[in-house]
Swiss-Prot record:
Compartmental location: Secreted
Protein name: U-scoloptoxin(01)-Er1a
InterPro entries recorded: Chitin-bd_dom, Chitin-bd_dom_sf, Scoloptoxin-like
Post-translational modification remark: Contains 3 disulfide bonds.
Keyword Disulfide bond among record annotations: yes
Length: 119
């Protein structure tokens, strides 16, 4: 009987551990300050905004037309939506798509529209 109790206890502990792990994986990133180890460079990149997949898209970067880097942090519970170029709920954007979405999203970021008016 004691063996049955031990087996049941071990199974309950294992199920609890699995539940806790799943719960942690489903939580959105909740950074409240810029993390250590942000490593991004604008060299070789077109001007625009880039989600940092290394930080689950909660960190994002802007490369200016001059190649200057500025790094930003989305608020707790949000990530950078590379398609819309805004911080958004994680349910609205899959961070794994950021690299493939970057070129199209940044295509017109720093372009100026010229207006032609006729006299």
């Amino acid at each position: 009987m004691e063996i049955h109790s031990n087996i049941i206890l071990l199974l309950l502990i294992a199920l609890f551990a699995i539940f806790v792990k799943m719960e942690d994986e489903e939580k959105p990133p909740n950074l409240t300050r810029m993390p250590e180890g942000v490593n991004f460079a604008c060299s070789g990149k077109k001007p625009g905004f880039y989600a940092d997949e290394g930080f689950d898209c909660q960190v994002y970067h802007m490369c200016s037309p001059e190649g200057q880097l500025t790094t930003y942090l989305c608020g707790p519970g949000t990530i950078f939506n590379q398609k819309k170029l805004v911080c958004d709920l994680p349910t609205n954007y899959n961070c794994a798509d950021a690299a493939k979405d970057a070129e199209e999203a940044n295509a017109n970021v720093f372009k100026t529209q010229s207006s032609t008016s006729e006299p």
